[in-house]
Amino acid sequence: SVACAVVCAVVFHIQLKKDIECYPTGKIRLIIREELLFFGIFLMWTYLAGFRPQAYGTEKFMDYGFMEAMMRSTTLPARDLWYSEGTINYYYGGQYFAVFLTKLTGSRVEVTYNLMRTFVAAFAFVFPFSIVRQMMKDRLYGRMEGRKKYLPSVAGVTAGVAVSIAGNVHYIVYRCVIPMIQKLKGVEETESYWFPDATRYIGYNPVNESDKTIHEFPCYSFVLGDLHAHVVNVMFVIFLVGLLYAWMKMIR
């Protein structure tokens, strides 16, 4: 972080000295606000991760083991942590990126495992915030008087919450609404609710054996502590969306 700050300061100095447009000088305040927003969301998710920081349950032990195996290895794929004669034959892109940052910062897996979780979760808030805020601002160009000037920020926060924090309504329906209806009918509750059930609604109710799938929405994976590629890839996909939007604005 310190090195990045130094590089940014040097590039900014070059911009001022040679009049090169490296940074949008009129947007420095916005950049600082978004950095503070990222830091705040990062701290929030770090606090939540602190309630269960252990690599315990579901696939977290495997995630942690993959990272340790890659930390020890000089080649890829790394040695399989369960079968030393073989190599990892499961997708490990998310764990690889976490190990890359771990080695880059000279840190240890026991530190960066949870920080990577919260790092991705924070980006999953700030990236949508920045993109949707800009989209709304472009949409309202020339019509930002009065209360409308707050709409871009409101839209940005809504987008950030939708991606990083919000989930589906499975818990509300299956843990609250349906049990309440059953209770009114005089039917006793026979099943308890397990939070991963929220990812299992396609093909499960009503049952469709030919079309069952598990939909792990971002917030579920952030709470669970998953570092699979489909989780870490969230920030890359949203970053690509931002680049595409910037490119579309440039060619119009």
What name fits each language-model region?
Residues S1-I31:
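Membrane-embedded, hydrophobic transmembrane alpha-helices
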Residues V2-C4, E35-G40:
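Hydrophobic H-region at the start of alpha-helical membrane spans
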Residues V2-I14, F123-F127, M235-L243:
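Hydrophobic cores of alpha-helical transmembrane segments in multi-pass inner/ER membrane proteins
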Residues V7, V11, E68-M71, Y245-K249:
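Regular secondary-structure segments
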Residues L16-P24, R133-Y141, W247-R252:
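Cytoplasmic membrane-interface regions of multi-pass membrane proteins
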Residues R29-R33, G40-F236:
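Active-site lumenal/periplasmic loops and adjacent helix-entry segments of GT-C-fold
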Residues S210, L240-R252:
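Membrane-interface transmembrane helices that cradle and orient dolichyl/undecaprenyl
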